[in-house]
């Protein structure tokens, strides 16, 4: 028994085959193009993403040597918030996918805030009014692509996050659905009642006719043969990437916390079966609905984590490969008072300031590129602590360890600095593809390979454990330097 998992991320699409114990058999990655039509705008081509998905699935099966008949289910995890609208009749997108990083909805969000509606929306959806989430992206497409608004009102247009788009295409238009974790990131879901909220839809002027059906992550979302399998298999195990990462790390219980380090970063705390919506900028979302039980999470997202390292390479040209940053950072005894605030598309949680620009502070004549590299790595850890402290304040939960995943967890400097700056141990996943493993676990649970969540948790092991070893005085000195840098930018 095998499960094929699709992990559709910001940079590319992975197809991964898991065995019945949740172990990786084989993986294939296909990257897609990034489009930046204007400063602060980011787009993907939905058709390219679907083609790449089919290519990755075909290749991973061929290269693995597994018989196609042995694959029992298809699971999907995806970049969240990214918004696609398409014609129901033709299945063709009306515009490119507007990516989660894209800031084009900023003016609409500001207008809604000025109308005094943010509190009401936060209470219902658990989210802050920000262009990061799907609602303002949907509205932009409706307002700016000719003819789409009228077609939407007539029920001819479908909206979906990437999971919905793939499910629609894989089922040849038979199923238009999403799961609650993805829906809760649109800024349109009432997280208390688990339904689309009519009042919020009216505020954003979004017709309900375009919305997908809501399903639990362990529902069967339809059937597909991917265009080449000898039989149709169920699509089961659908979850947004950050929720899937928490699930894949075994974060099933209240108080469990994980940090996913990707292009951006997601810090997510399981808070149990009831939402906790506060006036804090930390958002509350649906982690998942599995076995008819809802798990809610507090989440803080930062826009630039791995993306900051890519910037060092592609724009500054001071590294030729991201792996060099570890050695460069370790060559310094300290940070020299240099701080990089990577607000390339504004600041995410807990500040939510889309107007702030990136800056390097504290540079002096004796500083070199190594100080900038170290400051870039440190910025990731500081942003995670900003979120962590706010989560502890809201939830009154004191996590005793952090589960970490994502490509840059291989950077030993960053992981040790993260443990030091949080002052709790960091457990690093033994695989990078924890989001895919999360949805594979859901599919395997559905197929009967596991009896319950605890059995899954016992299967999870970690590659490394980083214990904090920095003194209290030094820790707080570093962190206060970061807070000072942030204050300067926020008050400019």
Swiss-Prot record:
Q: Which reaction does it catalyse?
A: glycerol + ATP = sn-glycerol 3-phosphate + ADP + H(+)
Pathway membership, UniProt = Polyol metabolism; glycerol degradation via glycerol kinase pathway; sn-glycerol 3-phosphate from glycerol: step 1/1
Residues that bind sn-glycerol 3-phosphate = 10, 80-81, 132, 241
Q: What class of enzyme is it?
A: transferase
Activity control note: Inhibited by fructose 1,6-bisphosphate (FBP).
List GO molecular-function terms, semicolon-separated.
ATP binding; glycerol kinase activity
Amino acids binding ADP: 10, 14, 263, 306, 407, 411
Q: Which domain of life is it from?
A: Bacteria
Cross-referenced NCBIfam families: glycerol_kin, PRK00047.1
Its biological function? Answer: Key enzyme in the regulation of glycerol uptake and metabolism. Catalyzes the phosphorylation of glycerol to yield sn-glycerol 3-phosphate.
This protein is called Glycerol kinase 1
